[in-house]
Amino acid sequence: EDNDLKNRLLNKYSGYLSSLWRELSRKKKKGKLPRDARQKLLHWWQLHYRWPYPSELEKAALAESTGLEAKQINNWFINQRKRHWKQA
C-alpha cells in the first residue's frame, strides 16, 4: 500500500519535482562576502561601535569601496548589530 501511494505520487509529481530541482540548482549560491570587503566593513564598525548606524551617504561610500550592493551593506550591518553590538 505504501509503495502504491509512493508510485502514484511520483507519477503525478515527478515532472514538477524535476523542474523544481533544475531551478534550485541554477540559483546563485550564497557565500561569504569577500575578505577585503569584510575588513572594510569591520574597520568602519570599530570606528563607530558606540553608534553603528551608517548614514545613507556612508552606506553608499562603503558600497563603492567594497564593491558590494547596498542591500548587502544593509544586511551586514543588521546582522552585525544583532550578533555583536551591546548598547552602552
UniProtKB/Swiss-Prot annotation:
Domain of life of the organism encoding this protein: Eukaryota
Subcellular location field: Nucleus
Domain ELK: 4-24
GO cellular component annotations of the record: nucleus
GO function terms (MF aspect): DNA binding; DNA-binding transcription factor activity, RNA polymerase II-specific
InterPro entries documented for this protein: ELK_dom, HD, Homeobox_CS, Homeodomain-like_sf, KN_HD, TALE_homeobox
UniProt keyword annotations, A-Z: DNA-binding, Homeobox, Nucleus
DNA-binding region: 25-88
Keyword RNA-binding annotated: no
Function: Probably binds to the DNA sequence 5'-TGAC-3'.
Family: Belongs to the TALE/KNOX homeobox family.
Protein name: Homeobox protein knotted-1-like 10
Organism: Zea mays (Maize)
